[in-house]
């Protein structure tokens, strides 16, 4: 977390904490037909309520927000998080611990619904869902994301380190190398991902630490384009203390994303190199 992010984070956390639980947990009249799905880990269990609060304060509001927790955490749910459950927000439990559960269980439960995935270590702005849905209406078949990188190769056709994958900031780019990055919110239309997305054994073998790459691969198998959102929002505000345990330390700093992408591309015979 950057030093300049601390003060905005503390201010936003304080503002969300002081909102009336009864007001933010009730259903808003202004809604969009979206299911928001996320997960968290034990080290963030006391912090994730701020992410949930920010989503409950969304305008428009989603039909449902589901937090997937490992079943071993059922007795450890903080009272402040539990109190947010109601018509919109609910906690469900999974036998798994990997990050992919943020989406796979919701795909099983709601195969005919548009699903938005978010991360658990940030606080989102109120217009996030409205802007994502507006972007979806413009490009209804595409996966829409507020942060996108392009899977990049060198002149020899070798995958570049993840830190060198280009950032995409234009919604007009239509290229199968576009990969949504989950932290800023990703919208998945109905049927956008291949049915193999639920193959737990396979993604644990090929991409155990990167749900982004697994979901990108499943989009490619279905011929689904990923697109930078034409209607964007400000980046979410990081939560102070949320980065003690983070996949970024492994995937980015140790370049595991590149290795996992090579595994996926080889297994599924995917070639995104320019001809």
Question: Where would I find each of the regions flagged by the language model?
Answer:
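Short beta-strand-to-loop acidic/aromatic patch adjacent to the donor-nucleotide binding site
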Residues: 112-123
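Hydrophobic targeting segments
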Residues: 32-38, 55, 63-68
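C-terminal catalytic/acceptor-binding lobe
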Residues: 1-19, 29-32, 50, 202-275
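Active-site-proximal specificity loops/subdomain of glycosyltransferases
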Residues: 68-113
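Residues at the starts of beta-strands that form the adenosine-phosphate
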Residues: 63-64, 114, 225
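Conserved catalytic core of nucleotide-sugar-dependent glycosyltransferases
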Residues: 125-200
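Active-site beta-to-alpha loop of glycosyltransferases that engages the nucleotide-sugar donor
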Residues: 38-49
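Short, acidic, metal-binding catalytic loop of nucleotide-sugar glycosyltransferases
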Residues: 51-63, 71, 83
